[in-house]
């Protein structure tokens, strides 16, 4: 049974968030956490927070299962564009430039690994 966590209205551009989301897509949860901890991108904090929430949601949905981070993997992660705030910046000769402050919605779906690899 899969679990989902959504982080909405994050004040980061979707393009920057997709860079971090691509790093952890399809990885096991423990490996994804290690990647996010060592990432220098500011969006990695939001992805880490949402990933922890998805793992907690999995534990709530499946209370009889004891699952570690090694047994879970990120089934899907996608970033959608949120609302765009439009602001103006004064420009020379009485003009104004438009600034678009973008936001995004992050969705992470985790699931249990079907055939865990044993070493």
UniProtKB/Swiss-Prot annotation:
The protein's name in its UniProt record: Large ribosomal subunit protein uL22
Membrane-crossing residue ranges in chain numbering: none
A GO molecular-function annotation: rRNA binding
Subunit description: Part of the 50S ribosomal subunit.
Domain of life: Bacteria
Keyword entries, A-Z: Ribonucleoprotein, Ribosomal protein, RNA-binding, rRNA-binding
Entry annotated with the keyword Hydrolase: no
Organism: Chlorobium phaeobacteroides (strain DSM 266 / SMG 266 / 2430)
GO terms (BP aspect): translation
NCBIfam families on file: rplV_bact (TIGR01044)
Cysteines joined through disulfide linkages: none
Gene name in the database record: rplV
SUPFAM superfamilies according to UniProt: Ribosomal protein L22
């Amino acid at each position: 049974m899969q679990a989902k966590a959504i982080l909405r209205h994050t004040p980061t551009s979707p393009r920057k968030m997709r860079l971090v989301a691509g790093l952890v897509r399809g990885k096991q949860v423990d490996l994804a956490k290690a990647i996010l901890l060592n990432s220098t991108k500011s969006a990695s904090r939001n992805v880490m927070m949402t990933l922890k929430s998805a793992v907690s949601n999995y534990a709530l949905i499946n209370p009889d299962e004891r699952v570690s981070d090694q047994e879970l993997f990120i089934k899907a992660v996608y970033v959608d564009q949120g609302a765009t705030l439009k602001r103006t910046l004064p420009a020379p000769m009485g003009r104004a430039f438009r600034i678009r402050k973008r936001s995004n919605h992050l969705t992470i779906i985790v699931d249990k690994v079907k055939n865990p690899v044993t070493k």
